[in-house]
């Protein structure tokens, strides 16, 4: 039995569809329910279309939260998920950059996450920098711990030079 067949046979998964702006299926991701090896398996169906979970259902006239994982996006109103750390495709979405609030996982020691946050600040995006009192890694964990995630995000969203200064104090890499 191949490894992929073994993964699907032995581990239950939640299948989440990705649609494009026109409501056409562009891919799916399969999330492990037990959190074992290969937490996410993603299959892209159409080339040239960024995989953005929830893009087909956001209100483009309101602020849009951009998070890493599809599960995290379900805890916020008007949110999309990039699936992992592929935030580099935001400029291809046709969404108004000023309406986007980029919400990375709370990983101040992760060099890749730090690079991506720095890049998004340089590109002029609104970014969330989690307060040091938050120890949970992602929105899902924060909600389970009883945090008011919407308020924390509202109070810790920065852009421009303020974001740059806050980022310098936040990162640990």
Would you name each region that the model predicts?
Residues 1-99, 112-114:
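Phosphate-handling DNA/RNA-contact segment within nucleic-acid enzymes
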């Amino acid at each position: 039995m191949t490894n992929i067949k073994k993964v699907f046979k032995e581990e239950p998964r939640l299948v989440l569809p990705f649609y494009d702006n026109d409501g056409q299926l562009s891919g799916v991701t399969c999330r492990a329910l037990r959190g074992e090896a290969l937490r996410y398996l993603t299959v892209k169906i159409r080339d040239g279309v960024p995989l953005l979970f929830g893009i087909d259902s956001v209100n483009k006239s309101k602020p849009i939260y951009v998070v890493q994982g599809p599960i995290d996006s379900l805890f916020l109103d008007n949110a999309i998920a990039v699936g992992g750390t592929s935030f580099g495709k935001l400029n291809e979405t046709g969404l108004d950059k000023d309406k986007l609030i980029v919400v990375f996982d709370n990983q101040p020691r992760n060099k890749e996450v730090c690079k991506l946050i720095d890049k998004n600040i340089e590109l002029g995006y609104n970014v969330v920098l989690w307060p040091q009192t938050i120890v949970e890694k992602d929105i899902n964990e924060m909600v389970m711990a009883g945090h008011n995630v919407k308020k924390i995000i509202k109070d810790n969203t920065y852009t421009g030079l303020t974001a740059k200064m806050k980022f310098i104090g936040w990162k640990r890499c």
